From Swiss-Prot:
Tissue: NK cells.
Glycosylation sites: N29, N66, N181
Organism listed in the record: Rattus norvegicus
Signal peptide bounds: 1-16
Keyword annotations: Cell membrane, Disulfide bond, Glycoprotein, GPI-anchor, Immunoglobulin domain, Lipoprotein, Membrane, Repeat, Signal
Domain called Ig-like: residue spans: 23-98, 115-195
Pfam families: Ig_2
Listed name of the protein: Cell surface glycoprotein gp42
């Protein structure tokens, strides 16, 4: 008698488990929109009595929508903070049957905005060897962002990946940069964009050391009679 009761219980539990299949979690709307709409789908055995099902949603193993009859989960204007691993759970009314979907990885990274490039230098007239700083900044875009600097299409130095939304490059001026276009590029795993090109200032002839040199001409004392100053060029 006890054996029959065990067998009947096993059969009953097996049939209960087959009332509905393992759920599948999917994203309904396009990844190009800012809204997030998820649907938890399961198939109920048509030969079994109708069962009242409840849907729960989880993000990174934390519940975000507890048992309800709604198989949909919606976030309006979702942002990067809503990225994560999502999962749904379907269970029967009495809670005896519970099935989980596989994880769905939602990545809500945003594209970089067009970077703004500025040139900073102390010298009034740039000469070869003077130090200048290129500063590339973006207002929007998921981190990390990779920055690259260009002079007439040729990369300057190595690409930079700082922790923030700006990168700077300190570099010595070259004579051939005179009047050429310079720009910077910002790139993350979603998109890339390039700043508006700008003209590099004219580079004066000579080097930075020559530009700052004072030339002193020594004349005989007899030539300086009546001259209260020393000639400098």
């Amino acid at each position: 008698m006890l054996l029959w009761m065990v067998l009947l219980l096993c059969v009953s539990m097996t049939e209960a488990q087959e009332l509905f299949q393992d759920p599948v979690l999917s994203r309904l709307n396009s990844s190009e929109t800012s809204d997030l709409l998820l649907k938890c789908t399961t198939k109920v055995d048509p030969n079994k009595p109708a069962s009242e099902l409840f849907y729960s949603f989880y993000k990174d193993n934390h519940i975000i929508q507890n048992r309800s009859h709604n198989p949909l989960f919606f976030i309006s204007e979702a942002n990067e903070e809503n990225s994560g691993l999502y999962q749904c759970v379907v269970d029967a009314k009495d809670g005896t049957i519970q099935k989980k979907s596989d994880y769905l990885d939602i990545d809500l990274c945003t594209s970089v905005s067009q970077p703004v490039l500025t040139l900073q230098h102390e010298a009034t007239n740039l000469a070869e060897g003077d130090k200048v700083k290129f500063l590339c900044e973006t207002q929007l875009g998921s981190l990390p962002i990779l920055y690259s600097f260009y002079m007439d299409g040729e990369i300057l130095g190595e690409p930079l990946a700082p922790s923030g939304r700006a990168a700077s490059l300190l570099i010595s001026v070259k004579a051939e940069w005179s009047g050429k276009n310079y720009s910077c590029q910002a790139e993350n795993k979603v998109s890339r964009d390039i700043s508006e090109p700008k003209k590099f200032p004219l580079v004066v002839s000579g080097t930075a050391s020559m530009k700052s040199t004072t030339v002193v001409i020594w004349l005989p004392v007899s030539c300086l009679v009546g001259w209260p100053w020393l000639l400098r060029f």
